[in-house]
Amino acid sequence: MKKVGKFSSFLTKYIGVIIICFSVIAFFWRDGFAWTTSYTSVFLGVAMFGMGLTIKMDDFKRVFSRPKEILIGFVAQYTIMPVIAWILCQLMQLPTDLALGVILVGCCPGGTASNVIAYIAGGDVALSVGMTITSTLAAPIVTPLLVYVLAGTWVEVSFWAMVISVVKVVLVPVLLGILINWVWGKQIQKISEILPLISVVSIVMIISGIVAVNAEKILSCGLLVLGVVMLHNLCGMGIGLGAAKILHIEYDKATAIAIEVGMQNSGLAISLATANFVANPLATLPGAIFSVWHNISGSLFAGIRRSGEQTKEAYQEVTE
């Protein structure tokens, strides 16, 4: 079990590299991964179930014990990224499918990998977990509503169909995982080290399938999507960090907020595009590329934030 736990930790730490490797393999060996697109919602549900299994009742206590930071993170999550997505789509004059995909990414809750990145960065992990929980539990209403408002100029959006999709692939699996952890907490604790493995494998399968199916399209518009995705992610982290500074939030908490804002549950964006926008097949592409990029940028950002006390002291001088 210890070896499996170490293997799970290794995969979680280097998920960005692993996603890139499997994406390259899927690009050239398309038949080996194309089948996974039929099970996108299943894989995401499994990943969210794995996340639910890691959430304890104490995590909810932390949420209520620090409402200010949680509220700031929540508002930043669901305003900064959606607005940036809409602005980029307008400025870059993106085709309908790609614009829809970018907006879907922007309107999703924080990604599960953000907690790991916050830990590596020396950020406030408890705050990161609290923000992920609140944004995820609110996603069944907030995400469809934002997509309906922002993407309605490009395509017809069925609000209630999206609500049902998010409930099925996010809310139900997460709540089921929380319930099982609450009832059988001691047993779950024994396998806690391998739980991230569930999410890693699921996300890798989702992205590999999207790459395999859209390999030809990636050649024609991949650089455009990559550029938009990079701007989206970096602007999100930068503005999130800037907002935290303006509000005089402590260094480690600001780090967690910036990471949480910039890193999205892009797997959900892919799932929603697959289930609700069949007529727009390329809408899955921004989510797939975002999944690769935000793990790379998140790791680099984590290294910068953890670089030393001088950075922290300089930050404190600015915020005081």
Language model feature labels by segment:
Residues M1-E320:
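Alpha-helical transmembrane segments of multi-pass small-molecule/ion transporters
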